[in-house]
Amino acid sequence: MGLAAPKNRSKISNDPQNTTWANNTSRFGHRILTSQGWQPGDSLGASDAAHAAHYTVASQSHIRVLLKDDNLGLGAKRGSERAENFGLAGLESILGRLNGKEAEVKKEEERREEIEKRAFVYRKYGMMNFVSGGFLVGDKIKSRDEVKTETQAKVEVKSEPESDGAKEDDRKKKRKRKDRDEAGVEGEEEPKLKRKKKSMDLRDQAKKDIAAESSKDKKGKKSKKDKKAVTSDPEPTSSGVASPASDPEPLTDKARRKAEKKARKEEKRLKKALKKAAKEAAKPMGDVEDLSSESEDESTPSASRPATGTSTPTVSAAGLTFNPRGMHSVRQKWIRSKKSATMDAQAMREIFMIKTPS
């Protein structure tokens, strides 16, 4: 039925805590519990249980019922988010500091912070109370002091005075162990030093080879320049670098890779140019003339043309027709009207309200 259903109004009783039922001693539950040894005010369960230490006054009191008078869901946060309670804690701390009660204010803030932390843990993980489950080993509970005294007594029994001969043997063993360790360290360091020396020699040799090659290259370049200056024409060349064809020496790997890359790029560029030229040649001359006339018509001011709701198909530079639809057609129409308005001098005067001299 929904909203059309009959309204059943429930009347709130004058006893919301249900104390009449709780105080009624003629109930079956009350009678059977009292026969088992329970009395009003006691908590349920064995009094000598492992978790009996965690019982509080709330365990013996009545269950509290909170009247729901809002549209919040079940388990929603209530009370602290009400408008009348907003900012009261901050105001109290400010007034306390002004009255010279900084220590009390700090304690109160720490207490509130601790409560918030506990509430966060409760919301995220639930209530976590440690309940002792008894002891695994032994029936008697011993204090820490007793355990400490027992361990000290055991240590005293074990530590007996050693003879002088045993002490001397220990010293000899330690000395021998120390000598062996030192010999092992020296033996490990020797191959390391040899390897280091060898690597240093190799580095020096490599440096010498590089220096010799660079000096040889410089000499070769100098002799080439001298030959070129003697045999070259008086006209200045476009680039000072010698061509790879006239270079008698073989190219390095890097230069060869660069030359190959350059040749590939040049080949690609030529292919593209040939393809473009073939396309242009294949196009009929009539299409080209039509395109040029259409572009001229578009460039002239079209103030006299009436604006229609339909979009006209546009021709791209490649000869393909493009018929805009939807958002594109509206935008193209707006661009055309804007272009025509800016190209018309009279329309611009009307927009900017400029009077023409009569």
Swiss-Prot record:
Taxonomic source organism: Phaeosphaeria nodorum (strain SN15 / ATCC MYA-4574 / FGSC 10173)
Region Disordered, residue ranges: 1-26, 146-342
Chief location bin: nucleus
PANTHER family in alphabetical order: G PATCH DOMAIN CONTAINING PROTEIN, PROTEIN PXR1
InterPro entries recorded: G_patch_dom, PINX1
Residue span(s) of domain G-patch: 25-79
GO terms, biological process: rRNA processing
GO CC, one annotated term: nucleolus
Compositionally biased tracts (Acidic residues): 287-299
PROSITE patterns for this protein: G_PATCH (PS50174)
Sequence ranges of Basic residues compositional bias: 218-227, 328-339
Cellular compartments annotated: Nucleus, Nucleolus
UniProt keyword annotation of Translocase present: no
Designated name of the protein: Protein PXR1
Gene: PXR1
